[in-house]
Structure formats: structure tokens, C-alpha cells
Amino acid sequence: MVDSGLADFVLPELPDLELEIDEHHRHKDVYDHTLQVLDRAIALETDEEGPVPAPDLTLRLAALMHDVGKPRTRKFEPNGKVSFMHHDVVGAKMTKKRMRALHFDNHLIADVSALVQLHLRFHGYVDEPWTDAAVRRYVKDAGHLYHRLNRLTRADA
């Protein structure tokens, strides 16, 4: 879609990811990373009996949009590192705006935007052990999107 130029008209946020280098994924730009996350998310969908039956438009759109906030939040730190603070929150707002412009259903917009905003929640507990309260908070915040959020997080790892 980006190579053909179609993204400029449908999802103009995607071409902006091509030259954004994420320090956690130095070997690829954010666009390539996004395509890998999308492929992984599709692979994590379940059959009709599972919690995330394929094809799952919600999970796929969340995977596609999960890092769209990075270009707007990129900051060069004094130590030479690059940060994307709050790209999850900014990305969720951008996702909501784009999906509204494309006339998606309000429930789908809410779910995809929530997944984009929550996609880093699990990573906040990587360096510390999870407390019972942290587990309850994660499950509560994910709500009905719990299985999708787990798959999105795993695809983004």
C-alpha cells in the first residue's frame, strides 16, 4: 500500500513510519517493524472456536496502527538516544481520527484505539515482577480486549 502510493490517501500515517528508526528495533525502520507485527498478529489469530477467530479485523488494524504516534513523539535525548514518549496515547488519538474519517463502525474504532493505547502496558512490567494488583489492573484495563491485547503485545515483542 505504501509502495503503490495508496497509503497516502487511505492511511497517510503509514508512510511517515518508513524512516523512523526505533532504538529497540535498530535493524529496521518502524514501518518494517509494523509489517512484522501485523504478520505475527495474523499468525496468532485462532480458529473459529478460539478467543480471537481469524480473520480478526480489530487485531489486524491495531497491529497496523500501534506505532503511528512515533513520528509525532520522537525526541532526541541528550545522551544520543531517541525516545517516543506517549506514542501509545498519541497513536490512539490518531487512530481514532483516521478510522472516523474512513467511516468505520464506532465499536471497532473504540476497540482498535484502546488496543493501540494499551499496547505498551505489558512492557511496563518487564523489569519488575508482577504484583497481584498489577495483574488485576492489566485484566481490568484490557476488559473484553484481553485476548487481543495479549496477542498484540506478543506480536510486538
Cite the ranges covered by each PLM segment.
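Long, charged alpha-helical interface segments
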Residues: 2-45
